[in-house]
Design a protein with these regions (language model features):
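C-terminal, charged low-complexity interaction regions
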Residues: 135-162
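N-terminal cysteine/histidine-rich coordination modules
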Residues: 1-74
Length: 162
């Protein structure tokens, strides 16, 4: 693990919204939400599917809820930043309790990113203006605190083996 992190303030959560590991609503085992090539800035294609290899459950996304508040711009609503997938709102598979908080990730790539950011002793922001919407800027203090670094990394490794 590197002691230095430069790219974590240029990465956004929507970049990990692909092949999300979730809990199957039918058998409670691991299922996967296939999102295809997802780009949060483009029109959503309706080829998103959830598939469970254990029980055969599968469902294709029919429609994404339109925004209800008239003050919001027109478009579709995807809830991100919570331990649920943004399409079917199923609980993510990679989640665990950590000191009263929830440590979670959409997939193994997201988990690797969290391990890299948390494990870095130096997190550089000076390569460009602050990116307040990036994951590095949005992670909670309990996760990035130096005194909890080893415990968080241990919890991440435990999730990796799930």
């Amino acid at each position: 693990m590197e002691n230095r992190s430069k790219q974590t303030y240029h990465t956004h959560l929507y970049q990990f919204v692909k092949d999300i590991l979730v809990e199957c609503p039918q058998c409670a085992k691991q299922a996967i939400v296939h999102t295809g090539v997802f780009d949060a800035l483009k029109k959503i294609e309706y080829n998103v599917r959830v598939v469970c290899a254990a029980c055969g459950y599968n469902k294709t996304l029919e429609k994404i809820s339109p925004r209800q508040d008239p003050k919001q711009k027109r478009g579709n609503v995807l809830v991100m930043g919570v331990p649920r997938d943004p399409f079917f709102y199923l609980p993510v598979w990679l989640q665990a309790d950590f000191s009263g908080e929830t440590l979670w990730a959409y997939n193994l790539e997201h988990l690797d990113f969290l391990a890299q950011h948390v494990g870095a002793k130096l997190r550089e922001r000076n390569t460009s203006p602050r990116m307040n919407r990036s994951i590095g800027a949005r992670l909670p203090r309990w996760m990035t605190a130096a005194d909890k670094r080893e415990a968080v990394l241990k919890a991440i490794e435990k999730l990796r083996g799930k």
